[in-house]
Amino acid sequence: MATFKAKARAVELLGKGQIADLPTAITELWKNGYDAYAKNLNCKLYLDSYKDNQSPVFLLSDDGFGMSETDINDKWFVLGTDSKARGEKINPAFGLKRRIPMGEKGIGRLSVSYLGPQMLMLTKKKGETANAFLMDWRILDNYNFFLEDLNIPLFAFDSVREFIKKLNESKNSFQTNLKSDNWKEQGKSK
C-alpha cells in the first residue's frame, strides 16, 4: 500500500510560492479576518528603529473570533481544511448574520510566509486563554524535512509575563528542528 507524504517545502510552495506580491499576501490574510467576522482589519509596518529591532516588523491584526488551541491544531495547521466550505455555524450569542466566506481552499493562511522569515501568531477566542506560536519559515528551506517531522511549539498564556517566558521557551523548542537528523546539506537524501 502506498500513501502520500509531504515535504515541509510544500508549505512554502502553497504559500509564498503562490503569492504574486505583498498586496496579494495581505488580501489573503484579510480574507481570513473577514471570515472570522472581524469588524476591524489592521496593517502596520514598524521600521527597524522600533524598540531596538534589527529588522522591520509587519503587524496584521483583526478583531475576529480568534482561535482556541483546538482550532489552531485542527484548522490552522491542517492544510486544505473544509470548515468554511461546510458553513460552520456561528454562535447565536454573537448576534451576527452569516457572511459568505471569502476564503475557500484552506491555504490562504500560508501567504503569511511571503511577509517575512518569521511569524508570531497571537490569538484569543472569547472565554478562553490566549494562544501563541512562533514559526520561522526558513526551516522549510530544508528539502529533506517532512511536515510530520516539524515541531512548532504552541502555548497558552494569561499574562504578559507568562507570554514572554513561554515565548523564550518556544524559541528554544523550535530550534530542535535544526538538530534533527533530517537537517542535512542540500542535495543529500535521508
Report residues per predicted region:
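GHKL (Bergerat-fold) ATPase N-terminal catalytic module, capturing the glycine-rich phosphate-binding loop
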Residues: 1-190
